[in-house]
Amino acid sequence: MSAVAENTTTEMPAPILFTDSAAAKVAELIAEEGNPDLKLRVFVQGGGCSGFQYGFTFDEITNEDDTTMTKNGVSLLIDAMSYQYLVGAEIDYKEDLQGAQFVIKNPNAASTCGCGSSFSVEDH
């Protein structure tokens, strides 16, 4: 009797969705800076009216505890502490009547403030 192994591996969805729109805007900003080594770092820190707030910055260095995602040639970095608050989130870039901005849709946020830049999580 012989057995044939089949590859039943399915691709898991990314734990964080980095949209095409966000990747395109980041690529544009990196091109303006003239430094192709830049990556977008997304982080969560204490503050804001709801307890936590999102932050965005460019970084050339990938730290040991960073999770790295790449979309359309653009790298996104998230540190381990921030990652736990961002699992399942969507990072997008929107342009509308209120202006242009990066937007995070976060299913882990129990509540958000009116401006959308800070959030709270439920106690476990």
UniProtKB/Swiss-Prot annotation:
What sections of the sequence does the record tag as coiled-coil? none
The residues the record assigns to binding iron-sulfur cluster are C49, C113, C115
What keywords tag this UniProt record? Answer: Iron, Iron-sulfur, Metal-binding
Q: Give the required cofactors.
A: iron-sulfur cluster
Query: Which example biological process does GO assign this protein?
Result: iron-sulfur cluster assembly
Q: Which InterPro entries match?
A: FeS_biogenesis, FeS_cluster_insertion, FeS_cluster_insertion_CS, FeS_cluster_insertion_RrpA, HesB-like_dom_sf
GO molecular function term, any single one: 4 iron, 4 sulfur cluster binding
The record's comment on cofactor binding reads: Binds 1 iron-sulfur cluster per subunit.
Subunit comment for this entry?
Answer: Homodimer.
Spell out the family assignment given in the record's similarity comment. Belongs to the HesB/IscA family.
Tell me the PANTHER family matching this sequence.
IRON-SULFUR CLUSTER ASSEMBLY 2 HOMOLOG, MITOCHONDRIAL
Function as written in the Swiss-Prot or TrEMBL entry: Required for insertion of 4Fe-4S clusters.
Extract the HAMAP family matched here.
Answer: Fe_S_insert_ErpA
Q: What is this protein called?
A: Putative iron-sulfur cluster insertion protein ErpA
